[in-house]
Amino acid sequence: DAYITEINENYAQLGNRKIGESKVEFITHDKDGNRLVRNAETNLGNFCSDALRVMTGADMSFVNGGGLRAPMESGDITFNDIFSVFPFNNQIVTAEISGQILIDFLEMAVMNYPEEDGSFPHMSGVTFSVNKSIPTSVKVDENGFFEKVDGAYRVYNVKVLDKTSGEYKALDPNGKYILAGFNY
């Protein structure tokens, strides 16, 4: 039908519209074809989480590795490229959280590290380390939702970007922070 064809053509024009360019390829896999985004930091994860943090003005942001669905080639970036990376209809959201909630969030997000896990966090505005020799002590309910950390934490050395100085400073567990992410 002509009406449907016209709608498809309009969406194709929008999708092919250039919105930026990159001199580097944004990766989801290594050169051997091993998926990285679910257990390693990648430039695609950094780019996406940095964009969320900057666009929302949040203190920090995250994109889970399971939500990064496609790489982006170097050169022109179009809406279709962004739709390929994020094919879901998720909305960007922000929330005020305590430093302790962030620590628990990170603990849950890396509970299966170094194994692949869609919850692996690509962060902006936060740095942290993981001691993978410590077994996870995260407890979840029957639906897989976080209940508590019942033992040693694997996550340590959590630092937050100070917007004024541009330096990373130790996280205050009692402090309040604005976190940006998706509402999936």
Per-region residue spans from a language model:
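Binuclear metal-dependent phosphoesterase catalytic core
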Residues: 1-21, 127-134, 139-145
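Generic alpha-helix detector with strongest preference for long hydrophobic helices that associate
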Residues: 3, 7, 29, 33, ...
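Glycine-rich phosphate/diphosphate-binding loops and the adjacent beta-loop-alpha structural elements
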Residues: 18-41
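Feature captures C-terminal
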Residues: 42, 46-184
